[in-house]
């Protein structure tokens, strides 16, 4: 028989021509068998087209088929598959079996064959080999012809895998990729389509398998094939840069097939001779079709009415504009939702935001994409049950399993268990029966609550169900037994029953997509287990190997969904838009690198490999360069699919705020349509034409109403006059009535924090003895932010406890060791001058070992990671102690006491602040180290505070109440020196010492002495020192000879005066600071008890308190809200600070 080509560019009416010709055939010969062959994804829409144009009589003798459904039909009528068909999951399992058996014969692929995802790559390559009829022997013969050694290795090993796969496959099964080969054999043996009329539409190219089917059916039937291209004579030369190159190549291959098989050539039909049928109502779209791929091109001179271009700020703005425009078309131009499609090249990035916005705008839509099975709760349950075993009961795997929702435990119990597990660091061996019992017994001894005992019961239930399953799969077992154990485990925890319960709920909520997904997932899992038993039932594998196979199957499983209604906007990928009747099309995300898409992944066979194989007659799928030009055809198809209206858009920023560039398509369209105005949120043409453009559907209109009311409250001019009527409509609407009532509350909302009554605060802040007892650091926290303080110390809010070693834990640990070190030195009467690095190291090591031994449950004993930390702490503390000993050695100050507490009723009395309101506040604290110096009949005090961070004394922060600790400690000691020291004392210094083992950077080699000096300089104490040269020299004798100190922040001139930059203050200034710190503390306490809990975090040039606040999610501080303002810490000069302190103290004295 014969073949006829039907030529026509996009929109020329090829599909309509086919249907009209089919209608004529039906009218003239009602017995004629007619086949309309289209790609798989277009069968549904094509069937609708045929029924709409021809009517029900078309169903009698016209069959709309894809190559796959043709296989099914032929096998049903003629018999076919005598072997069981293997699905993708079984195929992956078979590949895995082949790789395991042939692993010793592989060298190039040996290492990568064990990688996750390699099975998928091989599966895709085998599919490609079969589609392109690649013969194993021909492939193997290439190894003697190719010079590229790497390619030779690839081909040799791929041939081995391919051959072994086919042997195993064909012994018991048939692959879906072999169906077309089997179909070809059936068609040769049975003249099922003899004297039929075959119409082939919507194909761009054909695989060799498909071409073989066309060859066979064209021997006995008339075959009509549509080609989307110009009719070009003598187009033998291949030009891949031509947009139609892939279709021209298809034409040439069919012509060659006809010549070799003596198939007749009917006169072709050329539909390009007249105005494209699709664009009969739009000159602009016809112009785009004609010139979007033509060089040189012509510019459209007419007015622009059918094409829009929108530059969006971001993807949200982009999709919201699309939604508004869809509503406009439906409302004002009588479009149906089914006439409209929204497409993009990166549908995964857009599907969620489209769903949210379209639902808000009440736009019915169908998301034309398959659902990944890997995210289904049943799959998460199965994979995590394996991961618990494979990852040794890690926190992540256990709670991934529990939070699947299918274990039978309620959310409340899971949350409480999670908190308990995090707090106690329960993972790995701690999940065993003995450890759980040990923890339970300890809790009972400590008076465990009923809630805690419930947690242990839940733990035991979780453990028992999983342990029972793990016992059956741990180690090596045959696949049949593992599958059986998994199925019985799912039954035992009633996972399938819960899935059925969810399906009922989804049906009640009319969530059709969810119903379809969950109805399929159970059968997919069981089918996968059946495939595993069928293919690998007797194979012995370990748990990890089976998990890898199972997970690989889940990764590739997708659930297809079909539209649940007829009148819906179709949303999908650009590549799947062909075959639909689309009046209005929205192409979104037209950005550089996205449309046209960039093809980067070459796979196992690179582009160079494919080109070289092609030279030896082995033709595979297109290489990257060819795919890039094929992508141009995808773009051409997208730009020409709409018949009446086209809107193009691109965002300037992605979801993370990163800037995006427009695609080259945008500049091309601008040149073709020079009168096209690029719109944006600032310049929107539709707003000028539509007075009611903000009244769309309830939710977005309600949002616009809020903006209008806000503008009115702020006395801004409102152009629209209809908001009063809109407001009344919402007020009468039952769904929005309560929201309307809350609008004004929201608009007038001042996020500042309300005042709390004094009595309430007193009850919150007083301790068990009925006293207001605070630490200085607490007052500093109030100064940082009153609201944060109230949440932490008033409402007692806490972060979830986690079993980890935090910076505060490190601080406490270091303080304890340094305290123990000082006490040991004092007790054993070791002079600081006798301490060298070795002695320091030995003492510190002994102290840390003793501490960890006494506290066997310490986190530092828990894992190798924390044991390493304890070794590091030994090094850091040893270095710090050696530096302290050197600092003591260089001066004359002596350690008087360490870890001195006041307000504990042990060492010293609390500092008592008497407030103007007559309340008393008792301040407590702990001084890390007190040093004293007796000099010329006077005693000087030096207070040292150890810090594990890089803390520096800042007079500016002191002034604002953010750094009061050192001066409060000094004041407390000086006031109580007669009691503590048995004599009056004077201020000597207040200093911070950083506990660290610094890394010293040098430009070249240095001596040990120079290195020690660098370390001393790096760990130099910082703070304030008495401006007295004798006292300063008593802190570091070296200052006299060197002129600068390696111990304190001071340096001397030759005349004995202090150099600029020395942190020295006079005794009078020390007294001013003491007086000011008392005033500041009283002011802060008074503000606190007056109920001032305003949301006012401090902010300086380095950042704000909010950056490190644990309660920012509670206060919702937002600087864009009028009343939410930072308390700015202005950077003042030292002279300005001293003047301010004096002025405030003088004012205070005047008032009193």
Swiss-Prot record:
The cofactor required is:
Mg(2+); [4Fe-4S] cluster
The residues that hold [4Fe-4S] cluster are 785, 1106, 1109, 1115
Q: Name one GO molecular function term.
A: 5'-3' exonuclease activity
Domain of life of the organism in this record? Bacteria
User: What pairs make up the disulfide bonds?
Assistant: none
| Boundaries of every UvrD-like helicase C-terminal domain copy | 276-579
Any single biological process term in GO: double-strand break repair via homologous recombination
How is the cofactor bound, in the record's words?
Binds 1 [4Fe-4S] cluster.
Broad enzyme group:
hydrolase
Listed binding positions for ATP are 8-15
Any extra detail in the entry?
Despite having conserved helicase domains, this subunit does not have helicase activity.
Give the family per the record. Answer: Belongs to the helicase family. AddB/RexB type 1 subfamily.
What role does this protein play?
The heterodimer acts as both an ATP-dependent DNA helicase and an ATP-dependent, dual-direction single-stranded exonuclease. Recognizes the chi site generating a DNA molecule suitable for the initiation of homologous recombination. The AddB subunit has 5' -> 3' nuclease activity but not helicase activity.
What is the protein's given name? ATP-dependent helicase/deoxyribonuclease subunit B
Supply the source organism for this entry: Clostridium botulinum (strain Eklund 17B / Type B)
